[in-house]
Amino acid sequence: MACCGGGRGEGAAATESEAYLEGEAVREARELVAELCRHFYGQGWVTGTGGSITVKANDPALPLADQLIVMSPSGVQKERMVAEDMYVLSADGKVLSSPVSKPWPNKPPKCTDCAPLFMKAYLMRGAGAVIHSHGMETCIATMLDPGAKEFRMTHMEMIKGIKGHGYRDELVVPIIENTPYEYELTDSLAEAIAAYPKATAVLVRNHGIYVWGDSWINAKTQAECYHYLFDAAIKLYQLGIDWTTPEHGPINSAKRPRSVLSSSIPNGCPDSKSSKHCVVLDIEGTTTPISFVTDVMFPYARDNVRKHLTSTYSSDETKEDIKLLRIQVEEDLKNGIVGSVPIPPDDADKEEVINALVANVESMIKADRKITSLKQLQGHIWRTGFESKELQGVVFDDVPEALKHWHASGMKVYIYSSGSREAQRLLFGNTAYGDLRQYLCGFFDTTTGNKRETRSYFEISQSLGVDSPAQILFITDVFQEAVAAKSAGFEVIISIRPGNAPLPENHGFRTIKSFSEI
């Protein structure tokens, strides 16, 4: 019997031993899941038999990936859960232990419908626990902007409770569309997990949220923070306050009435005729000289990649970077990409692994590849450079004034660059003009899509919640990006800066040499 499909791992035989299955680790995990179910019922997260929880049965003698899994059942009242109600699964999803049937009116035992989704978090993120909540705030948070593919928030205290985030960071949670049956969400959840490598949660529109962590404590803590932040966003929305910007000013440039139940906003919804305008900026050759990126940023990453990998090799962040690089290199080797070399397995000598990683990264940098695995690692290396003051962000002189002007006029400004979101924030947060992030509302990178593909700009327009893509101005120096954005309905201006590549004759786009011309 299998709760969900999956190949058998090398540690399967060991994890299925009778001693482990009947041992203290599994017993404690059963009791823990039952306790958490009862606790979350009181929070309103798992009422009406909805929602579910799963944890790994912690055995220090086994790698996390090989540990047994305990899952709550389906159809059992969460406030009455006991350890004996739990299912125990192998690391690859095979049911090893099922609860016994209870007399009427109890339903026959059944493993949670969330099982295949839980397994995606275990296999793709190396999770130690996953929580699925139906908390009301998780549903309403996805309704604030029905067209948005992401929930975004910044400058809110509890953001720092989310792994990899601080108070000033922008929290981005992907939103997937709901389906009639839970198992039908499996593929879209997996796609969201793959597309958002820094995310520790996925929202399901009008449904709930999946949250994972490397332990049950981490998953629980993050789940509590997410629920707090969603509740805060809902309350800020009711007050007409924008939760997506650092200053948390009035929504829609103070044009929205103070009461969301104003007669001018039927049923508390913003006037569909109200006009929203956004500016989306490229970085290289638009806000920043290409020479700064090619002559300063790239060489710094190239020259420090070995030092960075060596000093941080055992950190969770670098392990995730290496994991993404492995996936990319395997694909590159299949496609015959020049400069790609095999990366030894994790249990190989550290220096051998690092040597292979350095060779691949140097080749990627030389080819100026716009791939997420490289950009994420570069961002982490640059962070060290900015923190040590070895690096300082460079922008053209006209950029700060334009950002201030747009900000003061209520225009929302976003960045879309092939560099990681972290790298973007580092650049604008550490300039000779001070921290310019206060004028920016969000950051997009290649996790949104390739900058030369029209669908990427369609995704951005959906995230920004405008009534029409034509309400977005995109400024770039790259002709192919301009064409893609225009095809998505954006207004487009091409930036002419020193060092930029020449444009085709009769390209048909408006051009500027300074933001002051806009």
Curated annotation (Swiss-Prot):
Disulfide topology: none
Pfam families: Aldolase_II, Hydrolase
Residues annotated for Mg(2+) binding in this entry: 282, 284, 477
Record carries keyword Metal-binding: yes
Active site, per annotation: 157 (proton donor/acceptor)
Spans annotated as Enolase-phosphatase E1: 279-518
SMART domains, per database record: Aldolase_II (SM01007)
Residue numbers spanned by region Methylthioribulose-1-phosphate dehydratase: 1-242
One GO process term, biological-process aspect: L-methionine salvage from methylthioadenosine
Pathway of action: Amino-acid biosynthesis; L-methionine biosynthesis via salvage pathway; L-methionine from S-methyl-5-thio-alpha-D-ribose 1-phosphate: step 2/6; Amino-acid biosynthesis; L-methionine biosynthesis via salvage pathway; L-methionine from S-methyl-5-thio-alpha-D-ribose 1-phosphate: step 3/6; Amino-acid biosynthesis; L-methionine biosynthesis via salvage pathway; L-methionine from S-methyl-5-thio-alpha-D-ribose 1-phosphate: step 4/6
Entry's Gene Ontology cellular component terms: cytoplasm
The keyword Metal-binding is assigned to this record: yes
Residue positions binding substrate 2: 417-418, 451
Record's catalysed reaction(s): 5-(methylsulfanyl)-D-ribulose 1-phosphate = 5-methylsulfanyl-2,3-dioxopentyl phosphate + H2O; 5-methylsulfanyl-2,3-dioxopentyl phosphate + H2O = 1,2-dihydroxy-5-(methylsulfanyl)pent-1-en-3-one + phosphate
Stated family: In the N-terminal section; belongs to the aldolase class II family. MtnB subfamily.
NCBIfam families noted in UniProt: enolase-ppase (TIGR01691), HAD-SF-IA-v1 (TIGR01549), salvage_mtnB (TIGR03328)
Protein name: Probable bifunctional methylthioribulose-1-phosphate dehydratase/enolase-phosphatase E1
Provenance organism: Oryza sativa subsp. japonica
